[in-house]
Curated annotation (Swiss-Prot):
Lineage: Bacteria, Pseudomonadati, Pseudomonadota, Gammaproteobacteria, Enterobacterales
Protein name in UniProt: Ion-translocating oxidoreductase complex subunit G
GO molecular function: electron transfer activity; FMN binding
Listed transmembrane segments: 11-31
Cofactors that this protein relies on: FMN
NCBIfam families for this protein: PRK01908.1, rnfG
Modified residues (FMN phosphoryl threonine): T176
Protein purpose: Part of a membrane-bound complex that couples electron transfer with translocation of ions across the membrane.
UniProt topology in membrane: Single-pass membrane protein
Similarity comment text for this entry: Belongs to the RnfG family.
Gene Ontology CC: one annotated term: plasma membrane
Length: 202
């Protein structure tokens, strides 16, 4: 039979190893969380640099928000970056959704001045048909760059219709739903961007 002293020693050892194991788990978890946070931060910065000039990226102060608005295509929270120059908000970069693509939702990133002038647009993800609807990708065609320097007036702005419907947006051979869906999403997103001074009381 173990002595009382041995029992106490074993209990202390078990307690020590339990504490050590728990501390190790917490330590590793904290390191992992910090690594994940850093990776996400790098991903966000990479996204922004896809749609704004390098000079603007490095010279403007950036503030990050999560925002929800039906103009962004759904009821989920979306990434928003506001860029400031001399403490004045000048540019917004927003992730949004075109919910009505031919093969499902299309995720896009839009950068625009708060007055509604578009700086850049990129498609982040989609499920469109290869060789047809996937021309929305910058790696496949320059179609998405055509939005640069366009101005959005309001949701009724007819410039953002396809040319076959009287607008200025090029369609794809054999595909009209996809480009119109993206164009509509770009327009809605910029209308949201124009609302930002009211939303944030800038």
């Amino acid at each position: 039979m173990k002595s009382f002293k041995e029992t106490i020693i074993n209990a202390c050892l078990m307690g020590f190893f339990s504490f050590f194991s728990l501390s190790s788990v917490i330590f590793v978890k904290n390191i992992t969380n910090n690594q994940i946070k850093n990776i996400k931060e790098k991903q966000k910065n990479t996204l922004i640099q896809q749609v704004i000039p390098r000079v603007m990226y490095h010279s403007f102060e950036k503030k990050y928000f999560l925002i929800k608005d039906k103009l962004l295509g759904d009821q989920k929270k979306h990434n928003l970056w506001l860029l400031f120059k001399n403490k004045q908000a000048k540019v917004a970069v927003v992730e949004s959704i075109a919910p009505d693509g031919y093969s499902g939702s299309i995720s896009i990133l839009v950068a625009a001045y708060l007055n509604g002038k578009i700086i850049g647009v990129r498609v982040l993800s989609h499920k469109e048909t290869p060789g047809i609807g996937d021309k929305i990708e910058i790696s496949i065609s320059n179609w998405i760059t055509k939005f640069q320097d366009m101005n959005v007036i309001d949701l009724k702005d007819k410039k953002f219709l396809l040319k076959k419907y009287g607008g200025k947006i090029e369609q794809f051979t054999g595909a009209t739903i996809t480009p119109q869906s993206v164009s509509n999403a770009v327009k809605r997103t910029v209308v949201f961007i124009k609302k930002i001074p009211l939303i944030f009381s800038l």
